[in-house]
Amino acid sequence: MAAGVATWLPFARAAAVGWLPLAQQPLPPAPGVKASRGDEVLVVNVSGRRFETWKNTLDRYPDTLLGSSEKEFFYDADSGEYFFDRDPDMFRHVLNFYRTGRLHCPRQECIQAFDEELAFYGLVPELVGDCCLEEYRDRKKENAQRLAEDEEAEQTGDGPALPAGSSIRQRLWRAFENPHTSTAALVFYYVTGFFIAVSVIANVVETIPCRGPARRPPREQPCGDRFPLAFFCMDTACVLIFTGEYLLRLFAAPSRCRFLRSVMSLIDVVAILPYYIGLLVPKNEDVSGAFVTLRVFRVFRIFKFSRHSQGLRILGYTLKSCASELGFLLFSLTMAIIIFATVMFYAEKGTSKTNFTSIPAAFWYTIVTMTTLGYGDMVPSTIAGKIFGSICSLSGVLVIALPVPVIVSNFSRIYHQNQRADKRRAQQKVRLARIRLAKSGTTNAFLQYKQNGGLEDNGSGEEQALCVRNRSAFEQQHHHLLHCLEKTTCHEFTDELTFSEALGAVSLGGRTSRSTSVSSQPVGPSSLLSSCCPRRAKRRAIRLANSTASVSRGSMQELDTLAGLRRSPGPQSRSSLNAKPHDSLDLNCDSRDFVAAIISIPTPPANTPDESQPSSPGGGGRASSTLRNSRLGTPCLLPETVKISSL
């Protein structure tokens, strides 16, 4: 102990000597409790929506965007906020991850958009919680399959229309894979389908026995041997069609190596190869057996229908996606067959005249029993054999039934995916049709607007030859009223003055009638007069703003009388909204060729309420409504004039 003290005591004394000058000086003040910068509140603005959180909350994950110093690039010094131009609904789930440590996947959001948000904020998909992980993976897998199908559809020609400068290979491949693109492709589609059916039917019919010439006894032989020339010509025509189709597909394929390795390409080769081998091989007894074997492969032509049947394609995709389940089923059946065949052989070995002569011979009984077929050609006779046969039958039911739900679910999933793909293609066609219709409608509206005088020639500028004519709101309402009246009355109204000239020619003062019609005012020596029924009841007059005339309250929006020419026989349509121009002039001509229609415009009366009610100049209680036309020499009432009073 003493040695230990002697060892460290010199160091303690030296330290005390070194501290002595510092001890003579006053100690600094004790540090006060000061708020740490890590506890400050940060404001995060995501597309206008403000989120507030503690800085320590974001610092929990320094490897992410919000937890590292990289977020300072998004700091706005003026507002004191971190601004992100991202989806605020997605950010709510991201911020909850910083708070709780568990990342949840929103069901109502797109899974691809969610992955993009996670990648932006530096979060990996493995952080998704266990409660949402399975659904997240299923949705992501389904989205990946959909994108792969869309990409395959674009490559095979089911996608959008090809551009104008497409090559002949692209157009030909699109016609093969999507026959509905053109009439020629559809015709070729049905022709190949017809020859496939003819080839399969001929392959079946040529084996039917046919009777030859009348002999005693009658001799029967297959139809293929009875009529060899007819079946040979039929087979030759089918093979030529199949060969031409295969060569054209090989020429038009985007990737020839990939096409040669495809299943459908192998089916095409197997379907046409036996014919050419039969032409090259001599017909003798030595090679007749091999030739007959090759003729069996002609039955594979029936698989060519898979190009014409969506159900067969779905079945093929289902079997391909269930390869692991089918492999498990085959492995389980193989094990069960070997086990039960061995047991049945030794159980029936001691009996006489037994069919279970060997273990391979017992395979047939085991396969038939496990698949619940039960032909009855091999049956056990001992009690042990019957017991093990019953166990074999029950085991087969269980082994076969286990993978069936998985296969059915995959078939249903692929079927619904194809339905959604067909629906998307139909919606895309409808959308493109609507776009074309909208473009056509926009063009027609522009031409109609130009035809109606909405555009005027601007000769001063070279860049813009046509410009929009400036119209007042009252003038637009004037033409709108004309258009509505033409639709409701089936008459066409012609104008004799431009709208501005018609307004300038009508004077608001010097009224001699209580009528509210502009046409009842004298505007010239040769003008025709039109009036409505006189107003004999006294009304309170009001004064308009910026006007010296008073207007009765009942005549503010009243349209008294309207005269229009009846249309000539023909289509009840109007070529122009605001004009019926001369025959020698274009529709988009100068404004002097367009004149305003005679329409009763509400005009303030000049008399006071206390004055008497004079009659209209037309005389009588009801004045005749006429049409002003500058081309008529004298005032007259046209025989085809239509009068619409007090609309």
Curated annotation (Swiss-Prot):
It catalyses: K(+)(in) = K(+)(out). Residues 510-520 have a biased composition (Low complexity). Keywords: Cell membrane, Ion channel, Ion transport, Membrane, Metal-binding, Phosphoprotein, Potassium, Potassium channel, Potassium transport, Transmembrane, Transmembrane helix, Transport, Voltage-gated channel, Zinc. Zn(2+) binds at H104, C131, C132. Pfam families: BTB_2, DUF3399, Ion_trans, Shal-type. It is found in: Cell membrane. InterPro entries: BTB/POZ_dom, Ion_trans_dom, K_chnl_volt-dep_Kv, K_chnl_volt-dep_Kv4, K_chnl_volt-dep_Kv4.1, K_chnl_volt-dep_Kv4_C, Shal-type_N, SKP1/BTB/POZ_sf. Residues 521-530 have a biased composition (Polar residues). Residues 360-371, 372-379 dip into the membrane without crossing it. GO terms for molecular function: A-type (transient outward) potassium channel activity; metal ion binding. The chain crosses the membrane at residues 184-205, 231-252, 264-284, 288-308, 324-345, 387-415. A motif (Selectivity filter) lies at residues 372-377. The modification Phosphoserine is found at S555. Residues 206-230, 285-287, 346-359, 380-386 are extracellular. GO terms for biological process: action potential; protein homooligomerization. GO terms for cellular component: dendritic spine; neuronal cell body; postsynaptic membrane; voltage-gated potassium channel complex. Residues 310-323 are annotated as: S4-S5 linker. Residues 2-20 are annotated as: Interaction with KCNIP1, KCNIP2, and other family members. Detected in carotid body chemoreceptor cells and in frontal cortex. Residues 1-183, 253-263, 309-323, 416-647 are cytoplasmic. It comes from the Eukaryota. The keyword Protein transport does not apply. A-type voltage-gated potassium channel that mediates transmembrane potassium transport in excitable membranes in the brain. Mediates A-type current I(SA) in suprachiasmatic nucleus (SCN) neurons. Exhibits a low-threshold A-type current with a hyperpolarized steady-state inactivation midpoint and the recovery process was steeply voltage-dependent, with recovery being markedly faster at more negative potentials. May regulates repetitive firing rates in the suprachiasmatic nucleus (SCN) neurons and circadian rhythms in neuronal excitability and behavior. Component of heteromultimeric potassium channels. Identified in potassium channel complexes containing KCND1, KCND2, KCND3, KCNIP1, KCNIP2, KCNIP3, KCNIP4, DPP6 and DPP10. The transmembrane segment S4 functions as a voltage-sensor and is characterized by a series of positively charged amino acids at every third position. Channel opening and closing is effected by a conformation change that affects the position and orientation of the voltage-sensor paddle formed by S3 and S4 within the membrane. A transmembrane electric field that is positive inside would push the positively charged S4 segment outwards, thereby opening the pore, while a field that is negative inside would pull the S4 segment inwards and close the pore. The zinc binding sites in the N-terminal domain are important for tetramerization and assembly of a functional channel complex. Most likely, the channel undergoes closed-state inactivation, where a subtle conformation change would render the protein less sensitive to activation. This is A-type voltage-gated potassium channel KCND1.
